[in-house]
Amino acid sequence: MEFRGDANKRIAMISAHLQPSFTPQMEAKNSVMGRENCRAKGGNPGFKVAILGAAGGIGQSLSLLMKMNPLVSLLHLYDVVNAPGVTADVSHMDTGAVVRGFLGAKQLEDALTGMDLVIIPAGVPRKPGMTRDDLFKINAGIVKTLCEGVAKCCPNAIVNLISNPVNSTVAIAAEVFKKAGTYDPKKLLGVTTLDVARANTFVAEVLGLDPREVDVPVVGGHAGVTILPLLSQVKPPSSFTPSEIEYLTNRIQNGGTEVVEAKAGAGSATLSMAYAAAKFADACLRGLRGDANVIECSFVASQVTELAFFATKVRLGRTGAEEVFQLGPLNEYERVGLEKAKEELAGSIQKGVDFIRK
């Protein structure tokens, strides 16, 4: 009879991830799933990651990609709708991470408790004719609510913020954390990796190279003219004609619009954004692990310019963005672009600050 009891207990544990009512508090009482180092079943110790907005266009693909990451031992999937379905689907993948789903505002705290990394793609997507700033009124409130949960339940977690407009939502998150007394500028990271991925891809097309061999620093922000690719600093070192510079800069800045228009109302850049978010999250996890020289571009608190936040290359480590790199030498085209970017960014950042301080 004891064997049957143990079997029933194991079955209950395996199916628990499909029940949104299953909480970390319940987990702690369980001698197997509540192990101190949070091992995945049969796996190695890893990190606890939460995705807020896991059932959305970006969130579903991102959930799949993070389930595949060997550095993740526990993956919490949260959304206000459809979280159980995404959780069940992703949980059938035979990779090491244990997956649990959380549904609705009442379970936000359970989804966040004890997390090492929180990724936030939640919010409404862009539609044809919309700019990222058009999303502000809806997404600003969503980010505020979710970051209040982070401040309460996992104040030491690294936060990867994807929700647009990133140029404003990072400032919103910072103000929420300041109010809660938990703000650590090194741990709040706006995800601009897709701008870099696009830059690498488009530049590689012009140069006839594999995109994996190309590195283009992209600085500034994450919308329109605030996205500034530094083509003078491309690796491998390359030269471009004025027309190529104009073409590449415009295409990189308008990459999101290109996808929105191509999908003709059926969505935005969800797949490439999920890829970029997973790539950046992996870099953050490698930094947390203590890997050396983990360098990515991110929109962070910065003293590189007079603005409070700015996207540049950063070195990721155990405490987040441990080093923020300077811009380096710019050519005249880039200096003009930088001034345009800063002017636009200043208003977007202030808009986020005012949303919380109003």
Curated annotation (Swiss-Prot):
The keyword Membrane does not apply. Keywords: Glyoxylate bypass, Glyoxysome, NAD, Oxidoreductase, Peroxisome, Transit peptide, Tricarboxylic acid cycle. The lineage of its organism: Eukaryota, Viridiplantae, Streptophyta, Embryophyta, Tracheophyta. The active site is at H222 (proton acceptor). It comes from Brassica napus (Rape). It is found in: Glyoxysome. Its EC number is 1.1.1.37. It is an enzyme of class 1 (oxidoreductase). Substrate binds at R126, R132, N164, R198. Residues 1-38 form a transit peptide. InterPro entries: L-lactate/malate_DH, Lactate/malate_DH_C, Lactate/malate_DH_N, Lactate_DH/Glyco_Ohase_4_C, Malate_DH_AS, Malate_DH_type1, NAD(P)-bd_dom_sf. It catalyses: (S)-malate + NAD(+) = oxaloacetate + NADH + H(+). The gene is MDH2. Homodimer. GO terms for cellular component: glyoxysome. This is Malate dehydrogenase 2, glyoxysomal. One of its GO terms (molecular function) is L-malate dehydrogenase (NAD+) activity. The keyword Isomerase does not apply.
